[in-house]
Swiss-Prot record:
It catalyses: O-phospho-L-seryl-[protein] + H2O = L-seryl-[protein] + phosphate; O-phospho-L-threonyl-[protein] + H2O = L-threonyl-[protein] + phosphate. The lineage of its organism: Eukaryota, Viridiplantae, Streptophyta, Embryophyta, Tracheophyta. Residues 52-351 form the PPM-type phosphatase domain. This is Probable protein phosphatase 2C 25. Binds 2 magnesium or manganese ions per subunit. GO terms for biological process: regulation of intracellular signal transduction. Mn(2+) 1 binds at D83, G84. Belongs to the PP2C family. GO terms for molecular function: metal ion binding; protein serine/threonine phosphatase activity. Keywords: Hydrolase, Magnesium, Manganese, Metal-binding, Protein phosphatase. Its cofactor is Mg(2+); Mn(2+). It is an enzyme of class 3 (hydrolase). Its EC number is 3.1.3.16. Coiled coil: none annotated. It comes from Oryza sativa subsp. japonica (Rice).
Amino acid sequence: MFSWLLRIASACLGPARRYARTRKDEDGGDNGGGVADGLLWSRDLGRHAAGEFSFAVVQANEALEDHSQVETGSAATFVGVYDGHGGADAARFISDHLFAHLIRLARESETVSEEVVRGAFSATEEGFLTLVRRTQFLKPMIAAVGSCCLVGIIWRGVLYVANLGDSRAVVGYLGRTNKITAEQITRDHNACKEEVRQELISRHPDDSQIVVLKHGVWRIKGIIQVSRTIGDAYLKRREFALDPSITRFRLSEPLRRPVLTAEPSICTRVLSLQDQFVIFASDGLWEHLTNQQAVDIVYKNPRAGIAKRLVNTALKEAARKREMRFVDLKKVEKGVRRFFHDDITVVVVYIDHELLQEKNVSVPELSVRGFVDSVGPSRISGFDAIS
């Protein structure tokens, strides 16, 4: 049923080589399929200060646009999921700079707070816009590159989560009946949400084109679905206007005021004994799984490889929607694969409360990057200096 689409896509995009830095899914995955997926990378289980984590990424685009990181150490845990669009420049920039800004601001303030997190987002946005300003003459399309940004920090028993865009953090907690329950603690900044459209309309009452229904999808200015991002400079400042001959990003009139913002939604949660784990994932996962489905999978299965299990479950659902077999989907090359699903990043962070209460937990200071097999040292010791 899908062969006609695959042939068309292949003709348009051409053959593609495997991404060289993947740790390939050599055994065909943890939940069936029988064929290795060379576009799937995973770190099945690692340690953090308050428990364990599992990490997986699957590539769909010709060039992976998701960047991600987990920073571990004895003082804190940091998770970042950066879902790029229009290219990987913004997501890569966030991965290289946001955590450093967070450490610097936390040390200056001698605490971690919503204000510190907000400041780290602002500094990252300004840094990327400065990069756009410096390079736009040679690389004009960098003004159209942006990224969603989802960040989680666990510090002294408190979870701080901040997001721009439609990546999502979901807590799995035990309710009164001891049943695992999903609680989304982020807000989807996507024009498909009525409240987001109303927010945009209230900010732009004189712009009848601020949200447009195009081919059944609500888009801001008829172009983009997400309302809060890092980057997308041409939708924030007139100085970054693109050549109007570029039809994909053409605005019906010059920008009067920013139509996108980099103001994150922030949630602060004191972790309770009922909180079992947190799932951080780009929207590629949530396109195919509900919050409760994802939480049930994590709760009912072993920890090792759970992020990969979530990714594979989403891929199976993507295959089912296209009336194709999962084993056939895994044979589809990057680039062509984007016709079937998006890049997907998943980090599952387990909360072990006995560790959460300990003050002298010894955890290696490591920086784990999505789709990169080598593990480097982390700067997370910067949190140690906070009194």
